[in-house]
Structure formats: C-alpha cells, structure tokens
C-alpha cells in the first residue's frame, strides 16, 4: 500500500505542481489567475479519466464524485484548497486535494463502488493571497460567502474580483449560494506547517482542534523630538513604549506555555529616521490558543498592561481588535475513529491542535470534520523550501484512504 502511494505521488505531484511553477522555484497560483484555471482544468481531466464524475460549482470549486450504491445521497468529502501564497511551496493545500483523489482511486480499484458517495474537492481559494478575502471556496459550499463582500474589491494590480472571475468562465452570484446539505463528513489531509511532528519523529498528526485567534493593530502616540537635544527623562518615545510592551507580553506568554502563542509581527515607527525620537509607532499583535476563555483572558490582561505602560509614560494608545475567531474543535467521534485507526495500524502518531487556520474550520461547525497532519521538514511552509519526506506523504495518503474506507465503504 505504501509502495503504491509512493509511486503514485512521485508521478502525480510533479505534474500537478507544474501548473503555476515559478522559474526560480516555488509556486504562485492565485485565485482566478490563468495558472489557477489551468490547474483546475487539468485536475478535472485527470480525475475524469480515472472514472470520477467531475464538475465545477458556480465559483470554481472542483469536485470529483464516486457514487455510493446504498446511500448515494450521503457524501463523504475530502480535499483542500488549490490556491497558493505568492512564491509558496507545492504541498500546502494542493497535496490535500491530490491525496483525496489518490486515496479514492485506490479504494475504487480495491473495493469497487462505496456504500456512501465519496467526493474529492479542490477548493477554489483559502489563502487570501490575491484579493482581501479568505476561505472563498469553503464558505461558498455552505452559503456563507456574501457576493457583496467581493463585488468591489481588487487585487494589488487593480484587477477586480468580478473581472478575474469572468475571465475564468465564472459569474459572481447575485446572492449567497444554497448551502450543501448532503455532506455527512469532511476529512482534510494537510501538511503540519510546523515542527512538532518532525521534532518528535512522528509521521501522523490527529488534529483535535484549530486554535482561536485574536489580532490587533495598536497605535502609540507620543511626541517626535530632536534626538540630540531631548534629555532621556523628557521623552515620549513610542518605540521605547513598544519595547516595554513587547518584552513584558512575550515573557508572560512564555510563562503561560503551550498552546498559547503570541507574535508582534509588524512594527512601524514614525518618522522612522535616525535623529528623531519616534513620536508614533503602530504594531500588530497575533495571539492564539485552543481555549476561548484562556485566549480572551490573556488578551484582556495584555490590553490592560499596554494601557498601564502608556499611562506611566504619558503615551496615547489606540487598540483595534480586528480579528476575534473562536477555537474550532474537530468532531469527537471522527477524532476517536482516526485515533483508533492509528493504533490499529501501529502508526507513529500524536493527537495535536492546529496553530494555523484551514478550510476544516469552516466545515467543522456544520458537518462532522477531522484533519490529518503530516510532517513539514524543518517546519517550513509558505516557502519554496516547503518539503515533506516521500514516506510521510505516502503514510498520510494511506491513513486518509483507511479513514475514507471506514466512512464510505463500511456501514
């Protein structure tokens, strides 16, 4: 089984990765670009040639379907997104779609038609790399995407969402799509995009939750002044205030420990010149945890600490909480089924959370959902150096195939 999947991956992954490949390495496959369209069209042809019924929905999500014999109205869905970040790797997203097809193709050959219908999905978009909108693919599956939210947006080059969509043969709907009611389970295989599995020598991650996230933009207002003539005790230095906030907050996060993570990712001092005390500094905060209450309490304390530091230093502060996403648990029964499968197959696995967002978080509140992680070498992703050992790739497809067998081929 592993040998079969290794060979299948070695043949199909370079093929699929050729669409949108950058000459200097990596991949760029943005929503409704020519590269995106070619990928979806070629993947559609390949799935059709293997015996699956293929179709696009109204926004470009691609499906490959194998009808069930006893419960054709019940769909077990597997796949991931087909788009990439700019100059990304060839595993994030697309390997989940490819793996679903390889797994279903093998199951069809071994066992014939399933009892329940199985479908591969290559979702149109997840990354938000071209337009300021994320999860366009999965949100449309459940009627969660409002066309008005994208009707007037453009990419960095001024191309409108609507025009890009039309160029690929799709038309923006006038209203949200009708939610699918036939999906009974969703299984997403994905690279970990972190270093936990590799660091522990494990090949499979059973995901039990996707972290909640809170993101802020914070602006500190002090006073710009001469760097040579303003004594230290008379300064309202916003970079100094930021440095105190950053140090204190990161130390608290370290004491809190896993799974809490805290990142000060973007810092913009003004006027940002060598001989002026910075009178304004804007920075971002990204905080994540699997427990909503812990995340809320930690960030509330962080806000209080920032205000206290600024009050002490006579610095004005504006705190904008612009993302507040709850943690998303995976389906307990599917997590248990997947864990039992790993035990039975004697796989080297761990139950873990996902520190990144995935399409599965759109599915999980609506249909039973689980995720399978495979290792990322050196924890690198969103990078041309994104890699996973071929044996781990094959182990992931095998695990997915066994899970789909239980869900669709057994009663």
Swiss-Prot record:
Gene3D superfamilies listed in its UniProt record: 3.30.70.360, Zn peptidases (3.40.630.10)
UniProtKB keywords: Cytoplasm, Hydrolase, Metal-binding, Purine metabolism, Zinc
Enzyme class: hydrolase
Protein location: Cytoplasm
Annotated residues for binding of Zn(2+) 2: 92, 127, 382
Activity regulation annotation text: Sulfate could be an allosteric effector of the enzyme that is responsible for stabilizing substrate binding. In addition, this anion effector may act as a counterion during enzyme-mediated catalysis.
Binding positions for allantoate per the UniProt entry: 215, 275, 288
Pathway: Nitrogen metabolism; (S)-allantoin degradation
Catalysed reactions, semicolon-separated: allantoate + H2O + 2 H(+) = (S)-2-ureidoglycine + NH4(+) + CO2
Function, as annotated: Involved in the anaerobic nitrogen utilization via the assimilation of allantoin. Catalyzes specifically the hydrolysis of allantoate to yield CO2, NH3 and S-ureidoglycine, which is unstable and readily undergoes a second deamination by S-ureidoglycine aminohydrolase AllE to yield S-ureidoglycolate and NH3. In vivo, the spontaneous release of S-ureidoglycolate and ammonia from S-ureidoglycine appears to be too slow to sustain an efficient flux of nitrogen.
Record-given protein name: Allantoate amidohydrolase
